[in-house]
Amino acid sequence: MRAKQRGVALIVILLLLAVMVSIAATMAERLFSQFQRATHQLNYQQAYWYSLGVEALAKKGIEQSYQDSETINLSQPWALKEQTYPLDYGQVRGKIRDMQACFNLNALAGVKLTPDSVKKPYLLTVLQALLEGLEVESYQAEVIADSTLEFIDKDDSVRTAYGVEDSYYESMIPAYMAADTWLADASEWRAVQQVGGETMNKALPYVCALPTDQWRLNVNTLPAEQAALLAAMFSPTLSPESAKTLLEGRPFDGWASVDDFLAQSALTGVDNAVREEAKKYLSVDSHYFELDAQVLVDTSRVRIRSLFYSNDKKTATVIRRRFGGISERVSDRSTE
């Protein structure tokens, strides 16, 4: 009898031991999970503060460029291509982009249209010519240009030949309405009629959405690879190839004035009316810049996009700051 009791006692002890081991393992797992969570939070906070430090550095670089020259050009410190810098337990990678080296879609909100208008507004022709230069079919390009204006103007009436308003978007699935205000980001352009994924990918390097309906293209910072935008401003006289050659021959520190730029031989054949119209939207300085940086601390990553604005060409102010973005997700095309 005692032998049987000893066997039962041993089984009970083994069961208790198994339960204790299981509880200990669970506690250890939870402790490790909490430790990892705390580590990730600390790393993310560190990356966040690093990103603000990068923003402050970019601000100084922009302000220094204003002090060093009367113009904004690609020879200045801010214009370095994407750089990577080491940090404690990580790194930062980023670049600054001149936001006046692209077509401001919100500038269309300032276009004045009247019922008896015969001639298409200049900015609409520029956007249409840009899209055509990017191999978008002519009719589709005109529809996109007109629809973009209708999408961001303040009324809900159709004033262009090929544009659409709320009634069109309400018929889609899911239904939505035209913004009737400025775009907050160029990615919102995807909601406009006929702006498909292929068109968006082609045009995105050439367009932007600034918080203003004003637009000036800085001819000193427009990359030669994006010469199609310059060609669109002088269409149909200036070809993309000639525009690219013109930008590749740009002085090291850029042109001193818009008149110096317009005096280039490549533009001598441009119609005077087109020249004068384009001149209104050309510049050799800039007021808007965007920092796009990614900070990596261990396995925690923070992406920051900061929009700087200067109204006095002395100090730069952050008027918009965003964290995260499109690059946070890498799409697996094989599953689509």
UniProtKB/Swiss-Prot annotation:
SUPFAM superfamilies tied to this protein: GspK insert domain-like (SSF158544), Pili subunits (SSF54523)
Family in the record: Belongs to the GSP K family.
Residue ranges listed under propeptide: 1-7
Spans traversing the lipid bilayer: 8-28
NCBIfam families the UniProt entry points to: T2SS_GspK
Topological domain ranges for the Periplasmic compartment: 29-336
Protein name from the UniProt record: Type II secretion system protein K
Keyword tags: Cell inner membrane, Cell membrane, Membrane, Protein transport, Transmembrane, Transmembrane helix, Transport
UniProt entry tagged with the keyword Ligase: no
Description of post-translational modifications: Cleaved by prepilin peptidase.
Gene3D superfamilies: EpsJ-like, GSPII I/J protein-like
Subunit structure: Type II secretion is composed of four main components: the outer membrane complex, the inner membrane complex, the cytoplasmic secretion ATPase and the periplasm-spanning pseudopilus. Interacts with core component EpsG.
Record-level GO cellular component terms: plasma membrane
Source organism superkingdom: Bacteria
Localization, UniProt: Cell inner membrane
Coiled-coil zones: none
UniProt xrefs under InterPro entries: GspK, GspK_central_sf, Pilin-like, T2SSK_SAM-like_1st, T2SSK_SAM-like_2nd
